[in-house]
């Protein structure tokens, strides 16, 4: 009989110091099944057993969009499916993508799929799992300041930002007067540069933890975008989405974390798309290994309905309104595609009906192969209809230049000779509003280095360079060429309105050789263009040239062609040896050049020029880093309203001159304000007198007409005879 010890309990015996490693290794149960690769699908059609194969085929094709499907089990009971099934994917990432893509998706009119992970079933089956609906806690609404408040400035001033060392300041532009602070200067506002959104609504700053957006009259922080170590950002066309890129892949835990904006499916990704208004991450991408990256990596359509990115042998187009799903459920497979570009505006295609919305147009190009020539292809989205294809030969590179209104597209084709020793450029210019999209070829003997369309116009400027000249850097080899459409004349010799002429032929207005210029920048308002030499610090050849393409005095123009829609005049020539960057203000009246300490330490500061090339303001600032204007949204005025403003420009000019005088001199300001007060007092006195007289039945300046208009006038007719010449002549007399 075994001994019994009533005073000894089993739980009191210490076992923590007992080594049971050998027992754990001996009896360890290996988990051979990875349950995170399985998903459970509810809501599937209940079908006869004979149609299970067809059902599996349909669902396999659907779920293959998330990843490779290894197996699909469809339970059958009493000769019919049970309405749910189990799917095994190749890896856990594919299973998570399937849950995200297809949970709640309508399969047809009567069936909606509900997708959950197999691991979730264990959690749902626990006794402590509550099935009671809990209404989510909605955070209280926080009113924000008007993000476009700077547009309400009474004098219509623009804003600009200066960065000096650790300090950043935002100013109102006051022409040649001292700038006025918008907010107090801030220290360490950003780790590096700051960026405005395309229309100036948001200001973005860089930080170790991610990106922050700022806005409103006081530039308060609006949202945070938690993406560590961001290197570059870009914005969508309508400012709805923000794209961030980090060189470090995302590290995401498997455990749910409300503070983390990323799910497990984003692990290892480096590219993120955010909703700017809410701060929510809507899409992430992994980058292809060992591939040269081109920024921006994500490009947007004019209305943000589509975004696309380039991949190996394909272009992936996503529909933003459908949770960033692939257009048509698949990528556009294009063998060896090199680059693509969206039209910056919607295009009214000639083949469409008048009431049809503007079309989204994309262009891409593929290089030459053994059996095919180089091609540039215009397509329409979302139907992927090919609008026009041009075939090219002996091509080295292709680049696209859109006119800002998407009326014209220049396909710049860099071609090589048969010996491949020399490269020259052809420009294929397409008119996108004309039927059948005609292309006009402009041939250049040299290689084009820069190309720039005039805003809202059909003229352009290029900088080219011959590859057959001396390589001595001290010799100016660049050529600046100005192009404009040829004037068209009807049979009677009358010039046809350039707005009515669809088929255009571009001609060289003037070519200016022997230049060091390497940058072209047009005024946003058009007409004026600046050509500059930037980058060679300390060089005497760093010059800035201003040109007017519509100079009114034809005696001073420098055209070599007269039958073109341009009258070219060189306005100013300026030397600024330390300039590193430049930017026009949104109005197109001022052009700022600056010297950044991020690039060199010589004469850091900025200079602002007007259209005539005169300096409006300049400052030398030690440790000066950056200068940039705040952009403006597109004008809301119609063409007729703009014409009305131009018609009354003299009246507006007088008003603006008065405002400028008031800002320039305090004494003048006081005098103008006094005169305004006197005028107001006189107007009030006159109204009071008018009211008093009206009560007596009289009106101001009552008078009795004493005579009619005809009675006041008397017609006097005077006849004068003047003898011009008098002579005497003897006339023979004939009798009858």
Curated annotation (Swiss-Prot):
Q: What does this protein do?
A: RNA-binding component of the eukaryotic translation initiation factor 3 (eIF-3) complex, which is involved in protein synthesis of a specialized repertoire of mRNAs and, together with other initiation factors, stimulates binding of mRNA and methionyl-tRNAi to the 40S ribosome. The eIF-3 complex specifically targets and initiates translation of a subset of mRNAs involved in cell proliferation.
Gene that specifies this protein: PRT1
Give the WD repeat ranges.
140-182, 186-224, 226-244, 245-284, 288-328, 332-375, 443-483, 511-557, 566-604, 616-662
Keywords assigned: Cytoplasm, Initiation factor, Protein biosynthesis, Repeat, RNA-binding, WD repeat
Signal peptide region = none
Q: Which PANTHER family match?
A: EUKARYOTIC TRANSLATION INITIATION FACTOR 3 EIF3 -RELATED, EUKARYOTIC TRANSLATION INITIATION FACTOR 3 SUBUNIT B
Region Sufficient for interaction with PIC8: list its residue ranges: 1-219
What are the subcellular locations of this protein?
Cytoplasm
Protein's UniProt name:
Eukaryotic translation initiation factor 3 subunit B
Assembly and interaction partners? Component of the eukaryotic translation initiation factor 3 (eIF-3) complex.
Q: What SMART domains does the database record attribute to this sequence?
A: RRM (SM00360)
Q: Which family does it belong to?
A: Belongs to the eIF-3 subunit B family.
CDD domains assigned:
RRM_eIF3B
Q: According to the lineage, what is the superkingdom? A: Eukaryota
Q: Which PROSITE patterns does the protein's record reference?
A: RRM
| RRM domain span | 37-120
User: What GO annotations for molecular function exist for this entry?
Assistant: identical protein binding; RNA binding; translation initiation factor activity; translation initiation factor binding
Per its UniProt record, what SUPFAM superfamilies does this chain match? DPP6 N-terminal domain-like, RNA-binding domain, RBD
Recorded hits in InterPro entries, A to Z, give: EIF3B, eIF3B_RRM, Nucleotide-bd_a/b_plait_sf, RBD_domain_sf, RRM_dom, TIF_beta_prop-like, WD40/YVTN_repeat-like_dom_sf
Q: Which GO terms describe its biological process?
A: formation of cytoplasmic translation initiation complex; translational initiation
- Residue span of region Sufficient for interaction with HCR1 and TIF32: 1-94
Gene Ontology terms: cellular component: cytoplasmic stress granule; eukaryotic 43S preinitiation complex; eukaryotic 48S preinitiation complex; eukaryotic translation initiation factor 3 complex; eukaryotic translation initiation factor 3 complex, eIF3e; eukaryotic translation initiation factor 3 complex, eIF3m; multi-eIF complex
């Amino acid at each position: 009989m075994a001994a019994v010890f009533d005073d000894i309990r089993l739980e009191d015996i210490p076992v923590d110091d007992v080594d049971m490693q050998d027992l754990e290794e001996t009896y360890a149960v290996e988990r051979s099944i990875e349950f995170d690769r399985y998903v459970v699908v509810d809501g599937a059609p209940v079908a006869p057993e004979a149609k299970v194969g067809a059902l599996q085929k349909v669902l396999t094709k659907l779920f293959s969009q998330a990843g490779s499907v290894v197996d699909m089990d469809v339970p059958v009971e009493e000769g019919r499916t049970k309405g749910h099934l189990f799917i095994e994917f190749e890896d856990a990432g594919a299973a998570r993508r399937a849950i995200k893509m297809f949970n709640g998706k309508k399969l047809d009119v009567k069936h909606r799929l509900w997708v959950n992970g197999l691991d979730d079933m264990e959690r749902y089956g626990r006794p402590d799992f509550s099935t009671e609906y809990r209404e989510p806690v909605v955070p209280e609404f926080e009113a924000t300041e008007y993000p476009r408040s700077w547009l309400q400035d009474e004098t219509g001033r623009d804003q600009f930002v200066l960065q000096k060392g650790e300090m950043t300041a935002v100013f109102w532009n006051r022409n040649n007067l001292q700038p006025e602070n918008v907010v107090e200067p801030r220290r360490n506002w950003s780790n590096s540069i700051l960026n405005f959104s395309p229309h100036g609504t948001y200001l973005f700053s860089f930080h170790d933890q991610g990106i922050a957006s700022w806005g409103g009259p006081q530039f308060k922080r609006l949202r945070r975008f938690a993406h560590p170590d961001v290197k570059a950002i870009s914005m969508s066309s309508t400012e709805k989405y923000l794209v961030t890129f980090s060189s470090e892949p995302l590290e995401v835990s498997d455990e749910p974390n409300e503070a983390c904006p990323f799910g497990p499916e984003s692990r290892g990704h480096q590219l993120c798309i955010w909703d700017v208004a809410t701060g929510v991450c809507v899409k992430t991408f992994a980058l292809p290994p060992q591939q040269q990256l081109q920024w921006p990596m994500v490009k947007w359509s004019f209305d943000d309905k589509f975004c696309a990115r380039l991949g190996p042998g394909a272009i992936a187009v996503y529909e933003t309104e459908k949770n960033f799903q692939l257009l048509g459920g698949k990528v556009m497979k294009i063998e060896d595609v090199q680059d693509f570009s969206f039209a910056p505006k919607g295009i009214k295609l000639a083949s469409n009906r008048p009431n049809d919305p503007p079309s989204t147009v994309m262009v891409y190009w593929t290089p030459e192969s053994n059996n095919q020539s180089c091609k540039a292809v215009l397509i329409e989205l979302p139907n992927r209809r090919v609008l026009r294809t041009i075939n090219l030969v002996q091509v080295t590179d292709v680049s696209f230049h859109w006119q800002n209104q998407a009326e014209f597209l220049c396909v710049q084709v860099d071609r090589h000779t048969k010996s491949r020793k020399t490269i020259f450029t052809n420009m294929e210019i397409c008119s996108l509003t004309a039927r059948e999209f005609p292309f006009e070829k402009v041939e250049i003997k040299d290689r084009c280095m820069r190309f720039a369309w005039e805003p809202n116009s059909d003229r352009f400027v290029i900088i080219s360079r011959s590859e057959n000249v001396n390589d001595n850097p001290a010799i100016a080899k660049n050529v600046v060429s100005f192009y404009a459409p040829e004037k068209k004349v009807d049979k009677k010799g009358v010039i046809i309105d350039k707005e009515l002429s669809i088929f255009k032929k571009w001609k060289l207005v003037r070519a200016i050789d022997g230049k060091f210029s390497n940058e072209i920048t047009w005024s946003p308002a058009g007409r004026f263009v600046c050509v500059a030499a930037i980058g060679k610090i300390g060089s005497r050849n760093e010059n800035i040239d201003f040109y007017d393409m519509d100079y009114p005095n034809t005696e001073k123009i420098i055209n070599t062609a007269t039958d073109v829609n341009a009258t070219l005049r060189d306005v100013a020539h300026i030397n600024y040896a330390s300039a590193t960057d430049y930017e026009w203000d949104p109005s197109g009246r001022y052009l700022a050049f600056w010297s950044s300490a991020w690039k060199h330490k010589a004469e850091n500061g900025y200079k602002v020029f007007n259209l005539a090339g005169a300096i409006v303001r300049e400052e030398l600032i030690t440790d000066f880093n950056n200068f940039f204007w705040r952009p403006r949204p597109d004008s809301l005025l119609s063409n007729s309203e703009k014409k009305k403003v131009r018609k009354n420009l003299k009246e507006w000019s007088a008003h603006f001159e008065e405002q400028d005088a008031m800002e320039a001199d305090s004494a003048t300001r006081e005098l103008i304000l006094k005169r305004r007060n006197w005028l107001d007092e006189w107007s009030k006195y006159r109204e009071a007198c008018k009211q008093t007289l009206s009560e007596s039945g009289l009106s101001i300046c009552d008078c009795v007409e004493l005579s009619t208009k005809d009675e006041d006038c008397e017609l006097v007719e005077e006849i004068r005879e003047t003898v011009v010449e008098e002579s005497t002549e003897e006339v023979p007399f004939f009798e009858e």
